[in-house]
C-alpha cells in the first residue's frame, strides 16, 4: 500500500486493538506498541498519573 489511492483505505477500522499485557484497547498494531502500558517499547509497564482515568475521584493504580 503506497501512494495517494491508499490513503482512502486508512479510515476503515480502528488504529488500536486490545493489548495482551494490560488488557486495554490501546495497542497499535502498526507501530507495534501499546499507548497505555508501553508494551512493545519497554519491558517495564509505564505508569503516569496523568495517563490513568479517575474513577470516583481516585486515580487508578
Swiss-Prot record:
Q: Which GO terms describe its biological process?
A: translation
Signal peptide range in chain numbering: none
Quote the cellular component terms of the Gene Ontology held in the record. Answer: ribonucleoprotein complex; ribosome
Q: Is NADP one of the keywords UniProt gives this record?
A: no
Q: Where are the annotated C4-type zinc-finger regions?
A: 19-37
Could you tell me which InterPro entries the record lists for this protein? Ribosomal_eL37, Ribosomal_eL37/eL43, Ribosomal_eL37_CS, Ribosomal_zn-bd
Reading the lineage from the top rank, the first entry is: Archaea
- For this UniProt record, give its keywords in alphabetical order, as a comma-separated list: Metal-binding, Ribonucleoprotein, Ribosomal protein, RNA-binding, rRNA-binding, Zinc, Zinc-finger
Cofactor binding comment, as recorded:
Binds 1 zinc ion per subunit.
UniProt: Zn(2+) binding residues? 19, 22, 34, 37
The keyword rRNA-binding appears for this protein: yes
Give cofactor(s), names only. Answer: Zn(2+)
The function of this protein is: Binds to the 23S rRNA.
To which protein family does this belong? Belongs to the eukaryotic ribosomal protein eL37 family.
Q: Which NCBIfam families match?
A: PRK04179.1 (NF003214)
Q: What is this protein called?
A: Large ribosomal subunit protein eL37
Q: Which organism is it from?
A: Metallosphaera sedula (strain ATCC 51363 / DSM 5348 / JCM 9185 / NBRC 15509 / TH2)
